[in-house]
Amino acid sequence: MTLLIGVPLETANEERRVATVPDVVEKLIKLGFSVAVQSGAGTGANFSDDDYRTAGAEVVATAADLWGRSDIVLKVRPPSSEEVALLREGSTLVGFVWPAQNPELMQQLAAKRATVLAIDSLPRTLSRAQKMDALTSMAGVSGYRAVIEAAHAFGRYFNGQITAAGKVPPAKVFVAGAGVAGLAAIGTAAGLGAIVRANDTRAEVADQVKSLGGEFVKVDYEEEGSGGGGYAKVMSEGFQQAQRAMYAQQAKDADIIITTALIPGKPAPKLITAEMVQSMKPGSVIVDMAGEQGGNCELTVPGEAVVRHGVTIVGYTDLASRLARQSSTLYATNLLRVIEELCKAKDGTINVDFNDDAIRGLTVIKEGSVTWPPPPIQQPVAAPKPAAAPVAAAASKGHGHGSGEPMSAKSLAIVFAVGALAFLLVGQFAPATFLAHFTVFVLACFVGYMVIWNVTPSLHTPLMSVTNAISSIIAIGALVQVAPPLGEAAAEGRPSGLILGLAVGALTLTAVNMFGGFAVTRRMLAMFRK
């Protein structure tokens, strides 16, 4: 039986996103589902009802009709009590739920015998789950938008300029927290020309900050900040004191501070105190991306932009929604990947398989039974390294060298003598043309070995352009063999049928390598073009 996927209008305040977009509707229909969208659901993201109709969806007039008919409901925000009341008993809900923060909502959904997949509970340590990771998608959009909001509230350029009217210094941006949102903010601010500094409790993100054009500011306190599931952990009091001292110093120098620090299931840590705000330069800006969880700044007002001590503090809780079309497109794609995992048979039905670690982590309620929190994922245990073999007491005289040791001078001399004798015999009895070809063959083997095997493995892909050049040399050699003789003297040395066949084969294989290599290289370079 084909299931109906319903997409309601989001009722949360200032929420403009929609759980699916017309392009994704077409893909859901190809999976065998029917799709219904509430009228006006996509208006905030600039998707009209006609766009959904064109994609094949049914447009439903009322929320009650949509919730009552839908087998699967796709949402962005957690459902309200009124929406839970409309949810059909035994149906499936997919979207943000935040089970740790919403225990009452969990009880209401369980009472409906619903199956609930919380996109925020996805195990982010699973590499194959990245395609479903809506938290990362929304955090990237929010980090970008945070810089845009900061630029709007800031009274100067981001980049430095020298004009006839005088010199304009670049803005100094400090980003607290270098997760997905923080890295997006760093890249955006650096792209606008600002001087960007950033800090995070996880020291391993320093290279990522530098790669985006920022400077990593380290806290003068030794403590590892990585927590489970790819998140940061709560730090010790000693670390927090050292961190506050560093933040106080940065606040005096920064023009813009963007805070992104969050700890799952807990209120946002207070990083920026009122005293730090007071020490900032007039006209400075703070964008607190943790406003929905209480804020990283003591003076943040969630959902509003306020001015305190001459500093604008932006506490908007709908940063991703302020880029509604982009956010909706990314979020809809994430949910599509979830549906694809649930509907591997592509028959318009779903199977919530608890043997799948990603689906097990997503599922917080199954048929009315609360299954959250999920059991920890069993990480594969690395095989123990084999014990080192005992070092031989003496080198083996039979081979001239021990294990891993270079050849002795005597053995090396013998090898060269044998090689010279072989060349002498070849030169004595083989025709002159064979000797010339054989010499070129030996040199080609040597050059090929030096070119390929002496290159670091990580550079093999960039080496593709060099192999294309070498392939062209081989192609020219094959063409010389295949080409007709230019005179009677040359006709006498024309290669036999076997040599011609080998030359044609070499030319064919080389052409495949050349054209294929250039095609792949072109695709690689296209990834870096804007």
Where do the model's predicted regions map?
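Rossmann-fold NAD(P)-binding glycine/threonine-rich loop
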Residues: 100-128, 266-318
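Hydrophobic alpha-helical transmembrane segments in multi-pass integral membrane proteins
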Residues: 474-490
